[in-house]
Amino acid sequence: SFEVKRGTTLAIVGPNGAGKTMLFRTLLNLAPYSGKIEWAGRVKIGYVPQRLSVSDIPISVKEFLSFKSTSNIGDCLSSVGLDSDEMLNKSLGVLSGGQLQRVLIAWAIIDNPNVLLFDEPTTGVDLDSEEAIYKMLSELKEKSEITILLISHDIHIVRDYSDYMLSINKCKTFFGESKAIMDPDLQRIIYGEAVCMA
């Protein structure tokens, strides 16, 4: 079991097939489960799945965001580090990987959720853009006291931008502060002797 405090970031890490995405599906009531999920107060969830194929859709950034909300589009783009004047009329198909991920994050937060779920939020972006996106999410959390849960394979980056980690590997599950979970001895218990900590 684990508990996530309001206004903190939980990174969920582990190998493919460990159950990370299934955990998100459970939190979204999209999969059956046993046990109990308790939310403190009213919860409104914003969600960006691991693969959301929107780049082939022939619509602009403005049109895409308008499917969810027509208010505060410019402010929402600014909050994820994008220039609204430059981006609004651009087609989704011409955006870089980093720009598209930021637009998807804007889509997730445009209706003011208090919990954000990101399944691999930096898929398909280069290392510099990856770190910039995590930094942006950290700043967003600080400004709005939003609670963020994110799935990532890159524990070396998310350790710097998360308050807590849930490390999953088959039957082994460990939850705690990120620095504690990153302890090399614990990582070897979770992932085996082949793990390399840098």
Predicted features and spans:
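Hydrophobic anchor residue at the start of the ABC signature
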Residues: 105
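H-loop/switch region of ABC-family ATPase nucleotide-binding domains
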Residues: 152-153
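H-loop (His-switch) and adjacent beta-strand-loop-beta switch element
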Residues: 165-178
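Short loop immediately C-terminal to the Walker-B catalytic DE motif
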Residues: 122-123
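Conserved ABC ATPase signature
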Residues: 91-95, 99
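The feature captures the beta-strand-to-loop junction immediately N-terminal to the Walker
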Residues: 13-15
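Catalytic Walker B motif of ABC-type/P-loop ATPase nucleotide-binding domains
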Residues: 116-119
